[in-house]
Amino acid sequence: MRIEVWPDYGPQNSQPIFDAFIKSLRNAGDEVLINKKTKADVAVIWSVLWLGRMQQYRKIWDEYRNAGKPVIVLEVGGLRRNESFKIGINGINRRADFANQTFDDRRWPLFKHTLKPWNTTGDIIVICGQHDASEQWKGLPRMEQWIEEQITEIRKHTTRP
């Protein structure tokens, strides 16, 4: 398989991850083309946040997705940030295919993380958002509007700040 990999536009912390990914592709016998536009079978980019250095990825994303070709997206992990990493097909988080239809339970202990019970008490409520320049936010309202909507909904259920 011919695979375009684009480390040049990734953030500073992405280079070792790209290097390891490129090595694994080559070890599998794939033809890897680095930072070269070649109309390959697959493209590999870092994140779907179209800001700063990474805004160059949007052209690659659009070209491959519009052609019906897959884009592999490398990204920092949600747990142990900058120690764990995600690899998704055609997106990240809920929009990605992680090819994990079958998996075992051997990876979870590697995180050395114990889940704590959900906290239903406390003095404040924290609303977490997403950067609205991300492909993940495509088609959704501006972040400011979304946060206002969440506050309105939460106030129907509690008086906590």
Region spans (language model):
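N-terminal pre-catalytic "stem/leader" segment of glycosyltransferase-like enzymes
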Residues: 1-51, 133-134, 144-145, 159
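Anion (oxyanion) recognition and catalysis
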Residues: 26, 65-67, 155-156
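Short alpha-helical segments and helix-capping/turn motifs at coil-helix boundaries
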Residues: 30-31, 35, 53-64, 110-114
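Hydrophobic beta-strand scaffold residues
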Residues: 32, 70-72, 161
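A short, gly/pro- and small-residue-rich
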Residues: 52-79, 148-149
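Glycine/threonine-rich flexible loop motifs
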Residues: 52-56, 136-141
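A nucleotide-sugar donor-handling region in carbohydrate enzymes
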Residues: 69-140
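Donor-nucleotide binding loops and adjacent catalytic segments primarily
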Residues: 138-161
